[in-house]
């Protein structure tokens, strides 16, 4: 096999990633038999080992499920796919159909499964390919909107916002009494990206908006796709107006999450953009807090959401009916209500895109109940390009370097730029090693990588957390 050249794959070999295997005892079975009986699930975060992975294994005692921490980047799975190492089941949080398109032919079509049929069509459309196939399904949503300090509104006798106009009025009223009406952690790419999209959800969800999103995500589209000239120019105009209405400036670009939380706790900030988890967090600290949606220009109200992760299955499973059935059982369990309850934080509301999961809202989301009941939960466009370009362009809008027109042109041109391909060789191995665990010999890939690192550092002993590598070692 040729030498593998890819800078991002460095994470496979050098970043310490915890991998936990929840396997039944296999006795003296051959490695081939163990491999055939094992369903490998790559989880995007170690947090899923706390409650989620153990629950799935408990529900499936007759199936050997091997959990491995993979990577929250679809480029990682593209690399595995190109080199014959794609796992049985994949999960990824930072996701877009655009970035997932190169994997399409290697993933199972789930469009006719009960799991896909349970997802509300308005949400499933975000995962449907141009040919009608569906490779990825979402688990429950993390809702993002405006975390609001009701105590400050009551203290200064300022009405809670009910639309965009009253939101702006509240910001202006707080400014007069020396309190910041709104800010957010704009040092992060996702805050820049979600604010830009959140202000124009109605338009991005319109016929024209969906038309553009379909073209942008089309797996058959071999050329890079930019922004359209219908929906997006106005989106940047709204962003420009929002910056003016809220008084965002260069200083806000240095704000991180801790800075925002400290301002909020000290009574210096009335509203910030963030996760609904913040409501419970501040309520527990004695601060009367509520959660509000994005107010749209046309009067609609929407929540920005991101699935905690998306799930896909390897198409190779269809070549073995026994393994396919096992994998489908694992998928069904992963998407079950009880399993999804173990994804979210304690006290957080379970917001599912599935009709099979009951909606049971707590007091923390009472002010957005009608929004959720209307299925106004927008799933963000979250390609790698959108993260990086949003950070660059929105930051320059906030600093005053770009107006709406300049921002649109810059964003569009950056989307159309061809990516430079790295030629860095990260490994030159004369032999391949499997990352499967076998009862007779452990994990060969983990062993050889551990020994390689030990040699690099001239150490007799390597101490690592659990199983520290995610992929096969490939022959050069």
Language-model-derived ranges and their functions:
Residues 47-49, 66-67, 129, 305, ...:
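C-terminal capping/gating helix-and-loop segments adjacent to ligand/active sites or protein-protein/ligand interfaces
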Residues 58, 64, 156, 283-346:
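Extracytoplasmic/periplasmic substrate-recognition and gating elements
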Residues 58-122, 151-162, 262-263, 270-271, ...:
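Extracytoplasmic "Venus flytrap"/periplasmic binding protein-like
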Residues 87-88, 116-151, 180-181, 296-304, ...:
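A structural signal for short loop-to-beta-strand junctions that line the ligand-binding cleft
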Residues 93-144, 159, 168, 194-195, ...:
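Hinge/lid segment of periplasmic solute-binding proteins
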Residues 135, 168-224:
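Extracytoplasmic/periplasmic solute-binding protein
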Residues 215-253:
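Glycine-centered hinge/linker elements that transmit conformational signals in sensory
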Residues 423-476:
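Solvent-exposed loop/linker segments at secondary-structure transitions
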């Amino acid at each position: 096999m040729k030498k593998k050249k890819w800078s991002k794959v460095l994470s496979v070999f050098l970043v310490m990633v915890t991998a936990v295997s929840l396997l039944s005892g296999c006795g003296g079975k051959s490695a081939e038999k163990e491999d055939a009986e094992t369903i490998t699930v790559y989880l995007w975060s170690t947090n899923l080992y706390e409650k989620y992975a153990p629950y799935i294994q408990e529900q499936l005692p007759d199936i050997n499920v091997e959990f491995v921490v993979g990577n929250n980047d679809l480029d990682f799975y593209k690399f595995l796919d190109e080199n014959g190492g794609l796992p049985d089941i994949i999960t990824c949080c930072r996701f877009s159909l655009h970035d997932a398109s190169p994997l399409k032919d290697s993933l199972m079509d789930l469009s006719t499964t009960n799991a896909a049929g349970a997802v509300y069509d308005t949400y499933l459309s975000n995962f449907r390919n141009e040919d009608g196939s569906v490779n990825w399904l979402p688990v429950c949503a993390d809702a993002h909107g405006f975390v609001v300090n009701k105590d400050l509104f009551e203290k200064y006798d300022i009405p809670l916002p009910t639309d965009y106009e009253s939101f702006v009025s509240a910001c202006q009223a707080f400014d007069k009494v020396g309190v910041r009406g709104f800010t957010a952690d704009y040092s992060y790419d996702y805050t820049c990206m979600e604010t830009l999209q959140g202000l124009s959800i109605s338009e991005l969800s319109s016929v024209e908006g969906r038309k553009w999103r379909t073209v942008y995500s089309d797996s058959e589209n071999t050329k890079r796709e930019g922004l359209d000239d219908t929906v997006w120019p106005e989106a940047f105009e709204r962003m420009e107006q929002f910056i003016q209405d809220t008084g965002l400036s260069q200083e806000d670009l240095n704000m991180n999450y801790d800075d925002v939380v400290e301002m909020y706790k000290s009574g210096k900030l009335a509203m910030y953009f963030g996760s609904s988890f913040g409501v419970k967090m501040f309520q527990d600290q004695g601060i009367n807090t509520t959660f509000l949606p994005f107010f749209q220009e046309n009067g609609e109200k929407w929540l920005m959401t991101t699935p905690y992760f998306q799930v896909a299955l390897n198409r190779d499973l269809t070549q073995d009916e026994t393994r396919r059935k096992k994998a489908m059982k694992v998928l069904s369990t992963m998407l079950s209500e009880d399993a999804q309850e173990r994804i979210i934080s304690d006290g957080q509301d379970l917001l599912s895109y599935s009709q099979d999961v009951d909606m049971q809202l707590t007091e923390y989301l009472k002010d957005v109940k009608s929004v959720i009941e209307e299925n106004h939960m927008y799933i963000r466009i979250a390609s790698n390009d959108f993260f990086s370009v949003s950070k660059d362009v929105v930051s320059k809008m906030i600093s005053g370097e770009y107006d709406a027109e300049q921002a649109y042109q810059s964003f569009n041109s950056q989307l159309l730029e061809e990516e430079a391909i790295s030629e860095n060789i990260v490994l030159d191995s004369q032999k391949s090693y499997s990352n499967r665990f076998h009862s007779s010999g452990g994990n060969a890939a983990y062993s050889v990588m551990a020994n390689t690192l030990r040699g690099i550092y001239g150490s007799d002993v390597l101490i690592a957390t659990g199983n520290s590598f995610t992929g096969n070692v490939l022959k050069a």
